[in-house]
Amino acid sequence: MFDALARQADDPLLALIGLFRKDERPGKVDLGVGVYRDETGRTPIFRAVKAAEKRLLETQDSKAYIGPEGDLVFLDRLWELVGGDTIERSHVAGVQTPGGSGALRLAADLIARMGGRGIWLGLPSWPNHAPIFKAAGLDIATYDFFDIPSQSVIFDNLVSALEGAASGDAVLLHASCHNPTGGVLSEAQWMEIAALVAERGLLPLVDLAYQGFGRGLDQDVAGLRHLLGVVPEALVAVSCSKSFGLYRERAGAIFARTSSTASADRVRSNLAGLARTSYSMPPDHGAAVVRTILDDPELRRDWTEELETMRLRMTGLRRSLAEGLRTRWQSLGAVADQEGMFSMLPLSEAEVMRLRTEHGIYMPASGRINIAGLKTAEAAEIAGKFTSL
């Protein structure tokens, strides 16, 4: 029976990790893998996470099942962080998920169960978006969201896609810190998006994976909160991997903004049912850590301060890198004004390969770089290697 299976292609980013590890050159640089790294090249554990884990170790008295919906206090605290007081809490359904990927898959399965077949996806996007949606049976319509040579969001294309979408279609939006481009939507553009989505009867699915990495915790969800205040229905997939440094703990959630308490209850029951037939229930530890941090003023303050330090470091790295890159590409001065961990450089696959073989700089063939993979002292030198191609 197993002989009937075709071998699946390796994930390009995972393959890149393997190549990087085998490279014995001391000056090698990993700009591919999407994790935050500090000045020593480590992916640190937040101080508040360590403190919360210690507290849980001392106080947790059971490992019993928690159910498909997950930790309800975690969901309440996370929604307060994401949605604020934008809408009535009883109109929001939430289910804890195994990370942001689990949230996106549950959202896609819910859309399919409701009879929705199509979802609009701006390109480039996170490489796993399309496979997740396809696996749920959704048809994907695409449009060009970002122009790499000019380093600019093609907002007219986004507007045209929304205007051309059929009522009931879903549309994937990045809340902030766009992966992989770092492209930024203005407040006015978010207002136009919200008005169009409401007018066209579309269902927004908003991917929130980097809250606090762009302009700040509240600023990074300002557009999302405006959208939630305008549209009657929306889905929000939240990941705690980056904002809390809980990558391998798989802590996330899917939230549904509905128009009534009764509607929220229906959505919640369907999300829980979909979870039950998939992974049954989410892992508890990461969510318990997040809940503990957000519930404790001192831990929350410490977490917020450390997150802000990381954000400011990435902002500084962007400025240093952009200063060097603009000597070859004037448009890449825009890298300094982009948000989050990622930017996309106008490099060919051959140039990406040269960077790897000649300089030990590892990045995907697409030209996407992880800003947080740089060290401050080497940013100018790395920029010089890019511009020397």
UniProtKB/Swiss-Prot annotation:
Residues recorded with modification N6-(pyridoxal phosphate)lysine: K242
Protein keywords: Aminotransferase, Phenylalanine catabolism, Pyridoxal phosphate, Transferase, Tyrosine catabolism
Pfam families named in the record: Aminotran_1_2 (PF00155)
One GO CC annotation: cytosol
Catalytic activity reported: L-tyrosine + 2-oxoglutarate = 3-(4-hydroxyphenyl)pyruvate + L-glutamate
One GO BP annotation of this record: tyrosine catabolic process
Superkingdom of source: Bacteria
Pathway(s) of this molecule: Amino-acid degradation; L-phenylalanine degradation; acetoacetate and fumarate from L-phenylalanine: step 2/6
Cofactor(s) it depends on: pyridoxal 5'-phosphate
EC assignment: 2.6.1.5
Enzyme class: transferase
Gene Ontology molecular-function annotations: identical protein binding; L-aspartate:2-oxoglutarate aminotransferase activity; L-tyrosine-2-oxoglutarate transaminase activity; pyridoxal phosphate binding
Entry similarity comment: Belongs to the class-I pyridoxal-phosphate-dependent aminotransferase family.
Database matches in PANTHER family: ASPARTATE AMINOTRANSFERASE (PTHR11879), ASPARTATE AMINOTRANSFERASE, MITOCHONDRIAL (PTHR11879:SF22)
Function of the molecule: Transaminase involved in tyrosine breakdown. Converts tyrosine to p-hydroxyphenylpyruvate.
Subunit structure: Homodimer.
Descriptive protein name: Tyrosine aminotransferase
Organism: Rhizobium meliloti (strain 1021) (Ensifer meliloti)
